[in-house]
Swiss-Prot record:
It is found in: Nucleus; Chromosome; Cytoplasm. It is an enzyme of class 2 (transferase). GO terms for molecular function: histone H4K20 methyltransferase activity. Gene3D superfamilies: 1.10.220.160, 6.10.140.2220, SET domain. InterPro entries: SET_dom, SET_dom_sf. PANTHER family: HISTONE-LYSINE N-TRIMETHYLTRANSFERASE SMYD5, SET AND MYND DOMAIN-CONTAINING PROTEIN 5. The modification Phosphoserine is found at S517. Disulfide bonds: none annotated. Keywords: Chromosome, Cytoplasm, Methyltransferase, Nucleus, Phosphoprotein, S-adenosyl-L-methionine, Transferase. Belongs to the class V-like SAM-binding methyltransferase superfamily. Histone-lysine methyltransferase family. SET5 subfamily. This is Histone-lysine N-methyltransferase SET5.
């Protein structure tokens, strides 16, 4: 028996056919991408390869066309779209912000360790230390959020008794004996709580939302309409609207008025204002998925029946339908909450939430790219502990970071601008920005000059071919990387730099494992 090694191509990757203009025997035609598709892929590229956030526009164009070889996209249109969507602003100081439209209530608060002070109209309020704190010391604890919001993607498991009705914790280790002994299940539906603590905190709200007919509370909530509202939020991943519904329902049940009082102390902004600064809407969006800014799509066909073709739905349409269902669930809601106030409640949740929950003290803490404090989550993401990252003096403002501290200055500021409406002016940002100004990038000047003389052609009549850039400026983040141990304490996602190598022509490339369309096969020749 003789074995022969033969090399063939994967059956779904005939590269020669693509380059020759045909694929599987049929004509291969390039498609013109939409502005949304271009923006989404640029932001996704920045997420996947943080080093490209500071690349020249020519290098960025080369990477995008390399990733999407089926696109018909000219360099002039690419630059025009990025400028219009503020994805390649040379001066971020000139872009739109919504910080001036955020309303800061005058309400203040304090305890033995910290106090809330009003800073000014631009910065609103901040949390200040009332005593000295050493590095690593716990500044404060928040045992629970204003209202606990279960993860939207776990509602199916919750409705089938596979996850806790309050916190969403999986119930695989909860025995039937324990459920019966501690009465952890609902008498009417399949809902189960993971502990007596969760049931005590959530049972009354669950009764109102899903079984209001039992307690004669139909006048304030219609259980059937509540399910329709929740289903709609699930369909469009509208976490903020779902959260607002739970918070409003808790306000109706709270005889002490504490929930409403804490909610009214939060900084507020309409979601309509926030959505104007969205730079992309797909998987690569700078906007957080939690912030209710995912692409709204529905499946339909020409005859109206559901089919596997997706159609984008306007944000306004989703908001209006969601508000209609919200008022259907809460019959008296329209008397005090109109459509614009509903959007303000959504925006308020988004700018104050921390990992999907709204906490009283945490909502007052401002941002800094080199914070003096960090947050630790314990007990299934319910309790928060605020630790001192460095020594804090009495009267000093306590700050945390809102964004990934390992990102470059441009990406950090872009995320802050889009998600919270301001540009960070901290010392670290200023130092990194000054580094860009001090170190001129000749490649960028040349690329910008070449693209600047192009006539802007939105119809993509210009040639797409262009020379590859020969290098890429390193992210300024590498000049001021925080200590890794400190980053881990922040409990936030971060990315590690990938080593770079230089080839014989001086081109900078990422070290990686390469895969192609070839496959080796051992053939038995008899």
């Amino acid at each position: 028996m003789t074995l022969t090694i033969k090399i063939g191509t994967l059956n779904d990757s005939d590269q020669s056919a693509v380059h020759n203009g045909t694929e599987n025997g049929s004509d291969f035609r390039k498609i013109t991408p939409t502005e949304e598709e271009i923006c989404d892929d640029v932001v996704l590229l920045w997420k996947e390869e943080p080093g490209t956030e500071d690349a020249t526009i020519q290098h960025l164009y080369d990477r995008i066309t390399e990733r999407n070889q089926s696109w018909k996209l000219s360099a002039s249109r690419f630059r025009k779209i990025l400028n219009e969507h503020h994805l390649y602003d040379t001066d971020l100081e000139t872009v739109s912000l919504y910080k001036d439209k955020i309303h800061f209530p005058k309400a203040l608060d304090s305890d033995a360790k910290v106090e809330v002070k009003f800073i000014d109209d631009e910065h609103g309020r901040g949390l200040f230390a009332k005593r000295d704190f050493s590095k690593g010391q716990i500044i404060l604890k928040e045992n629970k959020p204003i209202v606990y919001i279960p993860p939207l993607d776990k509602l199916f498991l919750i409705s089938n008794g596979k996850a806790c009705a309050r916190c969403g914790k999986a119930l695989y280790d909860l025995t039937q004996h324990k459920i019966m002994v501690h009465y952890l299940d609902c008498e009417v539906c399949k809902a189960i709580w993971c502990s007596e603590k969760c049931k005590k905190a959530h049972a009354s709200l669950h009764e109102l939302l899903y079984h209001s007919w039992r307690s004669n509370r139909i006048d304030i909530l219609h259980a059937g309409n509540w399910k329709r509202f929740v289903n709609y939020c699930e369909k469009y991943c509208f976490t903020a609207a779902f959260s607002v519904g739970l918070i409003y329902g808790s306000m109706l049940l709270d005889t002490t008025g504490e929930v409403k009082e804490q909610w009214q102390k939060l900084a507020s902004i309409s979601q309509r204002e926030r959505i104007k600064l969205r730079d992309a809407s797909g998987i690569g969006s700078t906007f957080s998925l939690l912030n209710g800014t995912t692409v709204h799509t529905e499946e339909e066909s020409d005859n109206g029946t559901k089919k596997g073709v997706e159609k984008n739905i306007d944000d306004e349409t989703v908001w209006e339908k969601c508000y209609e269902l919200f008022c259907g669930a809460f019959p008296k809601a329209s008397e005090e909450i109109d459509f614009e106030k509903f959007l303000t409640m959504i925006g308020t949740f988004n700018i104050n939430q921390y990992n999907g929950q709204v906490y009283h003290w945490i909502s007052f803490i401002n941002h800094d790219c080199e914070p003096n404090a960090y947050i630790e989550q314990v007990e299934e993401h319910e309790e928060l502990r605020l630790h001192a990252r460095k020594p804090i003096k009495k009267g000093e403002q306590i700050r945390i970071t809102y964004v990934n501290p390992l990102h470059g200055v441009r990406l950090r500021r872009r995320e802050l601008r889009v998600n919270w409406g301001f540009l960070c002016q901290c010392d670290r940002c200023q130092n990194e920005l000054s580094t860009f100004e001090r170190v001129p990038n000749l490649e960028k000047k040349n690329a910008d000059a070449n693209l600047g003389v192009e006539k802007i052609d939105s119809n993509d009549n210009s040639e797409d071919g262009s020379k590859k850039s020969t290098g890429n400026r390193k992210s300024s983040m590498r000049e001021a990387q925080p200590d890794l141990k400190e980053i881990l304490k922040n409990g936030k996602e971060f990315e590690l730099d990938i080593p770079e190598t230089v080839d014989t022509q001086g081109n900078v490339r990422k070290t990686s494992v390469r895969f192609d369309s070839n496959v080796s096969v051992a053939v038995d020749e008899r």
